[in-house]
Amino acid sequence: MIEFDNLTYLHGKPQGTGLLKANPEDFVVVEDLGFEPDGEGEHILVRILKNGCNTRFVADALAKFLKIHAREVSFAGQKDKHAVTEQWLCARVPGKEIPDLSAFQLEGCQVLEYARHKRKLRLGALKGNAFTLVLREVSNRDDVEQRLIDICVKGVPNYFGAQRFGIGGSNLQGALRWAQTNTPVRDRNKRSFWLSAARSALFNQIVAERLKKADVNQVVDGDALQLAGRGSWFVATTEELAELQRRVNDKELMITAALPGSGEWGTQREALAFEQAAVAAETELQALLVREKVEAARRAMLLYPQQLSWNWWDDVTVEIRFWLPAGSFATSVVRELINTTGDYAHIAE
């Protein structure tokens, strides 16, 4: 299995180094749910600003403040502890009265607004995230500048970030032990983290191999394509390749790679043979996903950061802003720009 740091680059390995997360204010994330609170209902949506706190810790503290069970507080996604982040929490508090959440106090956390909402906020129920990153001590400004220009046009590999695999790859190691021993895992969180890490690692491997051996944006017979921003997909046939290639070049369509699991992967013929060969050595992880009935799915191989802009504060410091859809990783953008240094460069929740 290829480790995250050794995955194939789209734009070649960066020539320079830079410091990421010199302080939390250098990594700002603003969650975009894509909708506003209803203003009524048995749930309360709470927008918080946090610095140095992980999401679960804040959710548990909010539950304690509201005197409800921790499972009654949900969120759309985990946010980096070593960053300044805005996100929404959702608490189930039936009744007409809205508690005074301005009295909620937690070091490193501030309530920005809150309102009633009809539905529970579920994991993954967000549109995306806006990022503002500051890279410091950049050793090669020209290389970073050119890479930013290239990313605007060609995007980056849509890899799952290192944080998906746990600190030191612990989640992936857990999945491998589980696959090898077949010992039942009853902890729901461990099961979820380990299965997610296994499937994500296989996806990354397929994308890395395709980057190594072919133009990742070249449609081949049997590829599974999806409309940009949509989840559904269809299979490319030989007769359609020229027209489909035009639509891919126009960023109307995206070529996908497998998220392996039980059931059909989605590709056919040449594309299916390539995907199967790319992960042929990982029989244990594939068997684990099938055994645990994790359904196979598809994910775009390339990621195009939206609203990408940057500003050089000086020759060694650059502020970069962009928006990514839910499920995408800022670290997968940064790794195409620079070799990062810093204690928390690869760490997230």
Swiss-Prot record:
It holds the Pfam family TruD. One of its GO terms (molecular function) is tRNA pseudouridine(13) synthase activity. It catalyses: uridine(13) in tRNA = pseudouridine(13) in tRNA. Keywords: Isomerase, tRNA processing. Substrate binds at residues 27, 129, 329. InterPro entries: PsdUridine_synth_cat_dom_sf, PsdUridine_synth_TruD, PsdUridine_synth_TruD_CS, PsdUridine_synth_TruD_insert, TruD_catalytic, TruD_insert_sf, TruD_pseudoU_synthase. Residues 155-303 form the TRUD domain. GO terms for biological process: tRNA pseudouridine synthesis. It is an enzyme of class 5 (isomerase). Its EC number is 5.4.99.27. GO terms for cellular component: cytosol. NCBIfam families: PRK00984.1-4 (NF002155), tRNA_TruD_broad (TIGR00094). Belongs to the pseudouridine synthase TruD family. This is tRNA pseudouridine synthase D. It comes from Escherichia coli O7:K1 (strain IAI39 / ExPEC).
